[in-house]
């Protein structure tokens, strides 16, 4: 770049700078005098995008060197030149572009009406009779109040309609919308930034380019497009950084927004560009940069553009050619050229207020037209001799007393401007133009813009495999679990023999292995919901067809299922001693893999047809457990009542267990041990003579072959049926995945919902006008820091040895400064150390080493409980979704204010906070889980600030308070912050690229670069002090430029030669003055007290507990759908089980089924507990934030959780046990004591399951891993509880585990309660027939004549005396799990700083 032209231009820089000063001043004056001259003035601006002059497309600034240097280097930045050339090379000369005409279009949603009502009421209109045109090369700015229909209009133009219908005429190049090409030709940037968190920026854009550009475009051209987009949107330096989310740290909110924009701009033919609030999260300079590039694309590619913006700056507004304003109800207020906007509104008697931004006027004129009536101009014209005709023109015929009732819609509809628009539609474009006339170069003949299914599938698989590689830890846990559980189960059934018990154990092992492979896949629910929003966006943009996406999900699951099955089977099969045949082993592996795929199918189908992950997590376990019950193991198919036999046939698990059981047992011979023969060896009548009623020593072995056992359960007793079962199972798998495909293709849940309003009863209070004023005046803090250094341990690759070695990274280097009451900005480029410095000052770092001196009001911070008088607003707005705005702030106040604060003072404080933050109108609105389903991003940030203000702090830290906000929302937030600072507090903000208006609100600035200070001091009036510092160093500042952008570019582009910015600062007067003040200790004024507090927490424990319990309860009751599902999830299975075992008799079957009933109740309890894991993990992040702020201690959080969860546990226990108990006819006992006792025991078991799931959720890092480990825990509880394997048959090496699991004590207690002393009998077909040797006689034998016999078989006969003690043991388990959960919460933090 350093050619002669550049050098010549650099030498003239000082003169140009002075000229620019004068020109800009003149332009500013013109702008103030007449708003209508904005466009003309901006044409003179060097940054005007419409000017193609090379000089005007370049910003020149100088690298710093000492002021005396004779040579000054420069850096030249070309804004849109590369982009323009790139487009020109690819656009045909005769390209016409896309003309859009909308003639009286309306959009409505059909709704049901009552008989007799008008048909008009059956249509809910969201857009109403809108007419406008879009022309290639022109840009339309779409404005309107929230809810006016801006997003909806863009979706209509983008052919992204929901359930509604369109009326009117909408044509593209005089043709109806072409479903096959419209999305390919249209760039649509939605409001939501939804990306795969673990992919890098480049990987995300490469995938978009492959989908958008198609298989006919070379890899080189795709890569070139990605590089161009990265460069044009300023993402090149973050191209290899992952996107990130709340669990994985990645790029910033503003950068995510730019990635969303970049995704769409990888398309080949941008003929129609639609952007829905693209500036959200971007500062004003970046917003201007992005829209200016869109302007270039519009001109060079002949694209038609419509962009909705929320209060854009004047410079941004002037980039647009036309304005379209929507009013309430989706009505058109104005459409026309920007130059005609003010004259039109003036003609109807309306105009902006003095010094009011034009965007604000456009946004609000439809709400309060009376506010903008030109009364003063009318009076002025009268004084100046203006005639009546001019007055009439200004008022537009409106009655001055009724301006607020003006029908702006009707006025515009009848205006000459609108009539011209309608007339122009007839002559917009030639009638014979083809839709294909606007295509870009290099499209082959016959190319319809679609890639082949094979191409789409290939890249979808590649993307999914990338994500799987990144998530290798999760899959490693699954594989390790498969090996571990294979060894555990194998060793538990080690080398099974051929006794009767060994035969039954084979069934138990098969069933349990099947259950294990079901619960390892439940994490797919979370995976589906993570990808759903991304898929919906890409589906709308026609990135790929539904089928390749569905196929990629299925294909990537098959190898995982197969590997998991092989690992498990290789351990379990051979250790347990199954048949040593290759075909049997392969069938066993196939059985486990198919079980895995069946579970995947069930979970995916449920997820596709439910709206939220929590609902799917509640429903999935209930469905799977019903299939498990009907599999034929828990209750034989021969015993299932006729009204439920169809469910047995529909249970895919029935065919799995049939296949694997027949595969193992068919062809085997079994015998009886002495105690297994009938009658048993210890039976009193065994050796008694037949004449005396005995058996004369005769015994039989009831089952001698594997077929006998298979027939007992109703399973197939042949070898070929296993292959038939495999085909049937594959049919189920295909059916489930086909239904899943239908759900993916046709089911779409609309995410946009208005935040919920909570109606609260207001107490009547006498209002005093004085109370509206902010009465509190705080004494801010004076913070000083000297010689501050911060190092962290790290690992680095040694290039010489190739090994990793431990190193230390110095993140802060010799930082000195002080902060006084007011606002101080911590600024610097990415990685400069802004957030690090603030965390160090706020005592928030939990890793690394800090050295130096930090004091507040003269006292060392390390000796202070800083959370008592400081507030810290984190960058991520982690809020309780179900609380209202007021309740969230009130919760913080009640937990963090001392008891000396009277209730009326708390209410006043909260009212003041709401007023200062402009949240009063929405104080009773629920916050919601995210900006899509709750309050906006800006209001969420305000609530975060309000929560910290509720602690009445003297010093407030704010980490990137404008992150993710557009320029207007950021300004509103910072206005609130300024009010806070003006109340006497000290405010410290990290902030990245603020607008000029925001930057000038700060009193102090500390600028960092790579951990070093390059400026510290006052900002000065209009930032004059900081600008003077850098201009004196040789940097050139252009008048009118944002000072924040100026100093950040200095930090981002250090000089290649000469003195560094940090060295120059150390030689400056600012540095010497600050060091002198620090050393002389004159910063803290006399009389300023040191904050002194006793204890870590301000509020008493009772107040904190009360607030936590109240919040926890509101979290439950404001999710009525979840409560209903909890009830139905227990009640429906209870009805199924109750009718399955309806009115149990005291026969042999009834005896065995009683214990099975108890175990099934445990199974449901365990499944129910897994459903709460996602909620706990999400709520955990709220605790981390509040704990860091010193809101309450961990033990109160756990205690409150127990108290508020207890009613839900009672609901779960009662809604299952009560209907099941009475339907099955279990024994009531005297005065019903057995019923109440068993209900109490079951409740304790449910509490143990819930507390164990809570422990896993608090201990483990992510939802999938927590659910996976919870499943393993449930497997252990079932395996060692004493049902699958009676305690007498558990190997000696595992007996300790039997006594360790709480399910043992619950099963034992309930079984004894139900069976002890209960008589049983045999039906005629249930007797065993014993032949008497040497005679022709036989004698019947009834195996179970008393419940004690069943208890003996399960090894529970010695536990009679422990029946009531087990209640204490179960309570102890609940307390132990709760205490371990407290320790996990207290000492394990998955959000590292």
Swiss-Prot record:
GO biological process: aggregation involved in sorocarp development; sorocarp morphogenesis
Domain ABC transporter, residue spans: 100-353, 783-1035
GO MF: ABC-type transporter activity; ATP binding; ATP hydrolysis activity; ATPase-coupled transmembrane transporter activity
Keywords: ATP-binding, Membrane, Nucleotide-binding, Repeat, Transmembrane, Transmembrane helix, Transport
Principal subcellular localisation of the protein: membrane
Similarity remark: Belongs to the ABC transporter superfamily. ABCG family. PDR (TC 3.A.1.205) subfamily.
Protein name per the record: ABC transporter G family member 3
Protein source organism: Dictyostelium discoideum
Name of the gene encoding the protein in the UniProt record: abcG3
């Amino acid at each position: 770049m350093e050619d002669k032209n550049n050098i010549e231009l650099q030498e003239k820089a000082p003169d140009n700078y002075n000229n620019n000063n004068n020109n800009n001043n003149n332009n500013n004056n013109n702008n103030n005098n007449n708003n209508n001259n904005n466009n003309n003035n901006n044409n003179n601006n060097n940054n005007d995008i419409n000017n193609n002059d090379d000089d005007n497309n370049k910003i020149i600034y100088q690298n710093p060197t000492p002021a005396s240097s004779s040579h000054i280097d420069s850096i030249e930045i070309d804004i849109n030149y590369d982009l323009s050339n790139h487009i020109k090379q690819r656009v045909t000369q005769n390209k016409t572009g896309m003309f859009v005409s909308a003639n009286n279009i309306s959009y409505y949603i059909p709704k049901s009406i009552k008989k007799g009502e008008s048909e008009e009421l059956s249509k809910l209109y969201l857009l109403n009779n809108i007419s406008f045109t879009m022309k290639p090369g022109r840009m339309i700015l779409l404005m309107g109040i929230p809810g006016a229909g801006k997003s909806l209009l863009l979706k209509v133009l983008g052919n992204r309609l929901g359930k509604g219908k369109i009326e009117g005429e909408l044509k593209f190049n005089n043709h109806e919308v072409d479903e096959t090409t419209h999305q390919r030709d249209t760039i649509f940037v939605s409001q939501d930034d939804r990306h795969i968190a673990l992919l890098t920026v480049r990987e995300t854009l490469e995938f978009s380019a492959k989908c958008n550009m198609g298989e006919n475009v070379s890899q080189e051209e795709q890569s070139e497009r990605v590089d161009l987009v990265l460069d044009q949107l300023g993402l090149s330096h973050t191209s290899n950084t992952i996107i990130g989310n709340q669990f994985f740290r990645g790029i910033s909110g503003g950068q995510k927004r730019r990635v969303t924009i970049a995704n769409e701009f990888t398309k080949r033919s941008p003929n129609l560009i639609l952007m829905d609030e693209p500036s959200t999260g971007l500062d004003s300079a970046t917003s201007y940069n992005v829209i200016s590039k869109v302007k270039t694309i519009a001109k060079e590619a002949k694209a038609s553009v419509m962009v909705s913006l929320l209060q854009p700056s004047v410079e941004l507004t002037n980039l647009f050619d036309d304005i379209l304003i929507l009013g309430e109800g989706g009505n058109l207020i104005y459409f026309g050229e920007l130059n005609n906007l003010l004259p039109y509104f003036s003609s109807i008697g309306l105009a902006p207020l003095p010094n009011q931004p034009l965007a604000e006027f456009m946004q609000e004129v439809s709400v309060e037209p009376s506010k903008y009536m030109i009364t003063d101009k009318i009076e002025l014209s009268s004084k100046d001799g203006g005639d009546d005709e001019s007055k009439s023109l200004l008022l537009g015929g409106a009655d001055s007393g009724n301006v607020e009732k003006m029908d702006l819609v009707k006025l515009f509809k009848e205006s000459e401007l609108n009539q011209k628009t309608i007339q122009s539609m007839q002559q917009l474009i030639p009638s014979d133009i083809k839709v294909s006339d606007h295509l870009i170069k290099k499209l082959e003949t016959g190319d319809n813009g679609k890639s082949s299914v094979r191409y789409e599938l290939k890249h979808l698989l590649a993307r999914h495999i990338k994500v799987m590689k990144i998530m290798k830890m999760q899959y490693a846990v699954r594989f390790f679990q498969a090996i571990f559980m294979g060894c555990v189960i194998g060793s538990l059934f080690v080398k099974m023999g051929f006794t009767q018990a060994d035969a039954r154990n084979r069934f138990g092992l098969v069933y349990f292995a099947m259950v294990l492979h079901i619960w390892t896949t439940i994490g797919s629910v979370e995976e589906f919901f993570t990808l759903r929003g991304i898929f919906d966006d890409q589906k709308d943009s026609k990135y790929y067809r539904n089928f390749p996406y569905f196929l990629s999900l299925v294909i990537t699951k098959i190898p995982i299922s197969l590997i998991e099955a092989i690992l498990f089977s290789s351990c379990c099969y051979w250790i347990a001693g199954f048949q040593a045949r290759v075909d049997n082993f392969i069938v066993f592996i196939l059985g486990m893999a198919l079980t895995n795929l069946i579970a995947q199918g069930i979970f995916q189908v449920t997820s596709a047809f439910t709206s939220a992950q929590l609902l799917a997590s509640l429903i999935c376990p209930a469905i799977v457990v019903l299939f498990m019950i009907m599999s034929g193991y828990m209750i034989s198919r021969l015993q299932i009542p006729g009204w439920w036999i169809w469910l047995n046939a529909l249970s895919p698990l029935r065919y799995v267990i049939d296949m694997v059981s027949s595969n193992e047992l068919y062809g085997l011979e079994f015998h009886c041990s002495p105690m297994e023969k009938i009658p048993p060896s210890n039976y009193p009548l065994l050796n008694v003579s037949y004449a005396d009623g005995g058996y004369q020593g005769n015994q039989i072995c009831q089952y001698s072959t594997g077929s006998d056992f298979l027939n007992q359960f109703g399973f197939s007793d042949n070898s070929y049926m296993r292959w038939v079962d495999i085909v049937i199972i594959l049919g189920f798998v295909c059916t489930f995945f086909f239904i899943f495909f239908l759900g993916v293709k046709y089911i779409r849940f609309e995410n946009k919902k208005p935040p919920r309003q909570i109606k609260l009863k207001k107490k009547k209070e006498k209002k005093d006008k004085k109370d509206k004023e902010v009465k509190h005046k705080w004494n801010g803090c004076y913070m000083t820091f000297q010689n501050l250094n911060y190092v962290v341990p790290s690992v680095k690759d040694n290039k010489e040895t190739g090994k990793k070695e431990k190193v230390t990274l110095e993140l802060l280097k010799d930082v000195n400064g002080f902060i006084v009451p007011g606002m101080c900005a911590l600024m610097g480029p990415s990685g400069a150390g802004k957030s690090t410095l603030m965390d160090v000052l706020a005592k928030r770092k939990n890793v690394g080493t800090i050295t130096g001196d930090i004091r507040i009001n003269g006292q060392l911070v390390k000796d202070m409980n800083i959370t008592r008088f400081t507030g810290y607003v984190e960058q991520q707005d982690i809020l309780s979704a179900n609380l209202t705005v007021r309740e969230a702030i009130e919760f913080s106040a009640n937990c963090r204010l001392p008891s000396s604060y009277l209730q009326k003072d708390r209410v006043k404080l909260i009212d003041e906070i709401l007023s200062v933050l402009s949240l009063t109108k929405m104080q009773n609105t629920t916050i919601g889980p995210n900006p899509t389903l709750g309050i906006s991003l800006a209001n969420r940030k305000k609530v975060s600030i309000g929560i910290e203000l509720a602690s009445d702090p003297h010093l407030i830290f704010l980490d990137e308070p404008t992150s993710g906000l557009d320029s207007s929302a950021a300004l509103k937030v910072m206005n609130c912050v300024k009010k806070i600072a003006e109340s006497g507090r000290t405010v410290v903000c990290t902030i990245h690229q603020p607008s000029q208006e925001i930057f000038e609100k700060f009193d102090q600035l500390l600028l960092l670069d790579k951990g070093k200070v390059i400026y510290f001091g006052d900002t000065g009036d209009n930032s004059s002090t900081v600008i003077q510092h850098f201009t004196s160093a040789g940097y050139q500042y252009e008048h009118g430029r944002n000072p924040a952008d100026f100093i950040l570019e200095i930090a981002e582009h250090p000089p290649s030669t000469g003195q560094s910015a940090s060295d120059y600062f150390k030689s400056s007067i600012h540095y010497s003055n600050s060091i002198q003040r620090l050393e002389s200790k004159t910063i803290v004024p006399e009389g300023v007290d040191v904050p002194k507090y006793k204890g870590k927490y301000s509020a008493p424990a009772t107040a904190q507990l009360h607030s936590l319990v109240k919040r926890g309860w509101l979290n439950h009751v404001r999710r009525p759908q979840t409560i209903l599902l909890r009830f139905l999830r227990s009640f429906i299975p209870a009805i199924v089980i109750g009718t399955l075992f309806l009115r149990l008799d005291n026969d042999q079957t009834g005896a065995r089924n009683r214990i099975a009933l108890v175990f099934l109740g445990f199974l449901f309890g365990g499944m129910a507990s897994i459903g709460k894991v996602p909620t706990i993990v999400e709520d955990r992040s709220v605790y981390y934030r509040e704990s860091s702020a010193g809101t309450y201690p961990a033990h109160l959080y756990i205690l409150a959780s127990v108290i508020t969860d207890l009613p839900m546990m009672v609901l779960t226990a009662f809604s299952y046990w009560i209907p099941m108990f009475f339907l099955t006819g279990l024994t009531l006992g005297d005065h019903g004591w057995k019923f109440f006792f068993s209900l109490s025991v079951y409740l304790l078991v449910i509490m143990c399951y819930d507390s164990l799931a809570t422990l896993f959720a608090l201990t483990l890092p992510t939802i999938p891993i927590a659910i996976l480990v919870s499943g393993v825990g449930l497997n252990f509880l079932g395996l060692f509880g004493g049902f699958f394997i009676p305690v007498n048959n558990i190997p000696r090496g595992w007996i300790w585990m039997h006594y360790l699991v709480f399910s043992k004590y619950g099963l034992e207690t309930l079984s004894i309660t139900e069976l002890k002393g209960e008589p049983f009998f045999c039906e005629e077909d249930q007797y065993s027939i014993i032949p008497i040797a040497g005679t022709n006689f036989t004698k019947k034998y009834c195996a179970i004549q008393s419940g004690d016999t069943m208890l003996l078989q399960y090894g529970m006969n010695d536990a009679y005396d422990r029946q009531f003690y087990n209640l204490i043991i179960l309570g102890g388990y609940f307390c132990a799990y709760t205490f371990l959960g407290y320790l996990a919460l207290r000492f394990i933090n998955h959000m590292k700083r």
